[in-house]
């Protein structure tokens, strides 16, 4: 049966998603929303997202590496200075017009910018706020200033021990030592679950009005 215009519309056609200075996990989560039709705006620092310049085997286009080209697909792009209050104001205006926020900045940083969940919810009660962090939003490590990275995600998950746990007696062979999983495994898994969580929250909001 041929689809009508309404039936062929992407599920998230009417959703807007600013993606605030995220790492690889944020890009993966936002990519899921974009694939479902959300208008997704990626916010980058003035010099560009550092992940633009990651190019294994020097594979890329016009100075942008293949991983970024893949995971930042289906986006609009804007540059903002996170250290400039004027940039905070622009991001806040974007956030207040959005349905979903995706960020990997620490809760303290977002609060200082006036873009934390509680602040935004006061003006936009139905907003879905996806905050991704290796250290979480609460607990003793939440405010750690160490830069978030895929290898930290993997190490804290315990995943590398599955790949290279030493076997038998004596010193381990190189291939038996705990080993980083290939690609951005930590970021991919975190981003996938984050994206699915945002979709679930949008569904809940649509069903309950909350």
Regions found by a protein language model. Name each.
Residues 9-48, 55:
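Conserved small-residue-rich beta-alpha loop and adjacent elements
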Residues 32-36, 97, 111-210:
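Active-site-adjacent "lid/gating" segments in soluble enzymes
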Residues 35-77:
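Glycine-rich phosphate-binding loop and adjoining beta1-alpha1-beta2 segment
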Residues 24, 47, 86, 108-110, ...:
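Glycine-rich nucleotide phosphate-binding loop and flanking beta-alpha elements
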Residues 22, 83, 183-187:
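Alpha-helix N-cap/helix-initiation motif
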Residues 28-31, 65-69, 195:
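Hydrophobic alpha-helical segments in the ANL/AMP-binding
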Residues 18-21, 63-122:
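A structured beta-alpha segment of the ubiquitous adenosine-cofactor-binding alpha/beta core
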Residues 1-10:
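Basic/polar N-terminal segments that are highly enriched at the extreme N-terminus
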